[in-house]
Amino acid sequence: MPMTLTPQRDPISGRRRVARIAVAAGLVAALSAAGPVPLVLAADGPGAAAPADRDVKSAHHKLGSDDADLLAEAKADGDKNVTMMIATAPGQTEQVSGQLDAVKGGSVGRADDKLGYVRATVPTAKADSAIAAAAKLSSVHGIDLREEIPLDDPTPSADAAKGAKATATYPAPGKRTPAENPYNPSFETGAVDFVEDHPKADGRGITIGILDSGVDLGHPALQKTTTGERKIVDWVTATDPIIDNDNTWRPMVTAVSGPAFTYQGQSYKAPAGSYAVSLFKESYTTGGDAAGDANRDGDTTDVWGVLYDAAAGTVRVDLNNNNDFGDDAPMKPYKDGHQIGYFGTDDPATDIAERQPFVVEVRKDVPMDPLGGSWVGKKSDFVNIGVIESEHGTHVAGITAANGLFGGKMDGAAPGAKLVSSRACTWSGGCTNVALTEGMIDLVTKRGVDIVNMSIGGLPALNDGNNARAELYTRLIDTYGVQLVISAGNSGPGANTIGDPALADKVISVGASVSKETWAANYGSVVEKKYAMMPFSSRGPREDGGFTPTLVAPGAAINTIQTWMPGAPVAEAGYSLPAGYGMLQGTSMASPQAAGAAALLLSAAKQKSIDLTPATLRTALTSTADHIKGVQAYEEGAGLMNIEDAWDAIRDGATSHSYTVKAPVDTAIDDKLKTPGYGTGLYDREGGLKAGQKKTYEVTITRTSGADKAIRHELHFENNAGGAFRIVGSDEVRLPLNQPVTVKVQAAPKSAGIKSAILEVDDPRTEGVDKQVLHTVVVSQPLKYTFSAAGTVQRNSSQHYFVTVPEGAKALEVAMSGLKDKSQTRF
C-alpha cells in the first residue's frame, strides 16, 4: 500500500538531501519524487521507531538547539518556571550561582564547584534575560534546560505477530540452567569463562552504580554476593523533590509534638518529642509498574502517615494505619543500617510477593522558591519513600551482577560485585535530565562506586555530544576515575541514531547484539545468521562523525524483575517463568552486560594491584573487541566486547596517548556543529559521492599527551566496508606533541549505500590501539521520479537503500509488494 511520509526536519535550501529507506523482507520499493528529508524506517523484529526531530536551531550558542525549543514550549504552555543545568569551568560556579540566585523568584537548587555544575530555577518570564546573562560569562560552557526523557519499553510484546504460536525451541531456564546459556548470554562477552578462569575476580571488591528506575530489594538473586556479603549496599532517589514533581518526596513543613497531635482531621499518637508530619498516598505511584497499588491489595486508595524526627534523622511510617507511631520502627536511610519496610503482607503460599519493599531517605534544606508565593526564600527538609518505578532497573541490575538466578548456577555478569541503586525515573513514564545528571554526580562523588551503568537516553535533534550534561559526564570520568557505561539507544537501524548521553566523549556507549541461539531461546524465533546486531540498536556516527557506539554486547536477556510481578516470558518462546523473572530487550540490556564484564576487569586489576584507569579500560576494550561478520563499523563500533583478550592487554600494560581529531563533516545540519563543517570523525552524507567515484579528504590529528617529540604512528583501516577507504600516501605518520598533522584519506565506493571503516592511529610501542577514528560516507542512487529495488532479507534483519532526493520535492511514497502471507515486513 502506498504511504506518504512527512519530513522530520525542514528542508535546507540549496542542499542536496539523501533519503534512506530500511526494509525488512523480500520486496519491491517504488519512490515518488520526495522532499528533501532524511527518512528512517523501522526494521522487522523487535524495535522502536525513531522519534521525530525538532527543528534544529544554532548549536553554537551555549543554550542548545533542543533547549531553545523547550524554552519556547514552556512559554507557549504557560509554565511558571524553567530549570536550567549549567556546566561551568571547574571551580567557577560562584559567579553564575550568585547571578541566578539574585533573579526575583529564582533559586539555585544544587551546585558542585569542583565539578563545575549549577542547577537553577527561574520564572519563565525572566528566563530569556537570565539565560542571556549567564551565557555571557566566560566561565559558563553550556546550558541545558530540564526535560523528561521517555524510558523505552523493553518488552518485546509490541513487536510480536498477532496470533503467533509458541514454538518451544528451548526449554524454560531454571535452577539447572548452566552458567553458559543463551537466556542471559553473558558468556558472549567472555564473562563466564573469565569468572571460571579467575574465580576470585568475579566482581568482588567492586561496587557498581545503577542509575535507573530503582532496584527491587526483595529479589533472592540480589541479596548476597558470591562471598556472602550484602549485594545492594545503598539505595537512593535522584529526583528533585519539587521540580521533578515526584510526590514520593514528602515535604516536612508541618511541625507536631508527641505524645499526641492532630493532622488533617486525624488524631495521632507518637513518642514524646518534636517532629514533622506528612502523608504518603500509594496513588503517587500510579504511573509506575505498581499502578498506584503500593501494598498489592488491589486498590489505589491507601494512605500512610509519615513522621520525621529531624534531630535523630529517622522516619516512622504508620504501616498498620492505627494512627500510633509508637509501634512503628524508626527508620534511617538505607545505607545507615539497611532497614527495609514493606507495604502489604506476603502470602508465602503463592509464587508472587504480595508486598513491596521500601526505604527512606532525607534531603535537608531544599529551596522552596519554585513553589512561588510565600515559599520564596524558604527551605524545607523532605523525606522520600523509596520504591521502584518499573521493572527496568531491577532487570538491569540482575544482568550486571545477579548471583544465583533461579537459585542455580545462572548469574549476572559480575556475581561477586555489590550494587548501589539510584532511582532517576519519575511516575510519568520517563526520567528527567536533572535526575540523570545529579544522580550520576551523586553516585560518583558520594556513593563509593567504581563504575556506573545507565540504561537511559534519547535521540536529540543534534546528536553531536556538545551539551552541558555530556561535558559533565566527561568531567566525572576524568576527575573521579569512574567509568560510565551507557546504552546507545533503541532508534536503529538507521545511521546517526545514537542517543544522548551515550554521545559523551569518554563514556562507553553500548549497542545491542544477538545470537541465533538467543533468538530461539528467548523469542522462539528461528533465524539463519549466527550473530548480528539487534534491529533496534542505535547506530553511529554522531552528527560530528564521532565514534559511536563504542562497542556492543548482548541485548536480550531473561533476568530479574520485581518479585511482586508475575513472570514475563515472550509468549512465542513457549514456556512460562516464575514471578520475579522476565525477558526484556534493548541496548538497556546490552549496557549492563558491558558494565558487569568491565567490573570483572576492575576486580581482577584490583587483586593484582594494577591501576586500571578509565582510559586504560577503554583502550583495552576497544583494542580487543571482536568484529561481527557482516556488520559495519558505524553499527558495531569496535565490535563485540571480549574481556578475556582485554585482560591480556591490561596485563601487558595497555595504554594509549590522547589525541584530538578534526575531520570534514557534510550533512544537512553540519553548520550547527561546534565547528561548522568539521567534527571528530569523517562523515560525508550530503557531499554527492557516487559509486565508482573517488574523493579525497583531509583529516587532522593532534597528539596531546606523551613525549615532547615526534612519535611514529602506523595508520590502518579496520572493518573497511567494501574496501571503500584507503590512506593516500604513506601508512605511517610522525606526530609531534600538540602540533596538528594532516593525513589524507580517500573514499572510492564501488556501490551505493553507506560505507564505514575505522582509521586506527597507533603507536606500535604501546599495547593497544591508541586512537580509532570513524569514517562514514553515504553513496545514494540518483532519483529522477521513481526508484525500484527487489531483494530478500532474513528474518529480524534489515536492508537499506539510499536515494538522492530532487530539490523541491514535496512528498515521498513507498510502495511495497511481493510479500508472503502473514509477513511482518515493514518499512
PLM region spans:
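Hydrolase catalytic cores
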Residues: 397-400, 420-426, 450, 497-500, ...
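A short beta-strand micro-motif common to beta-rich folds, especially ectodomain repeats
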Residues: 699, 753-765
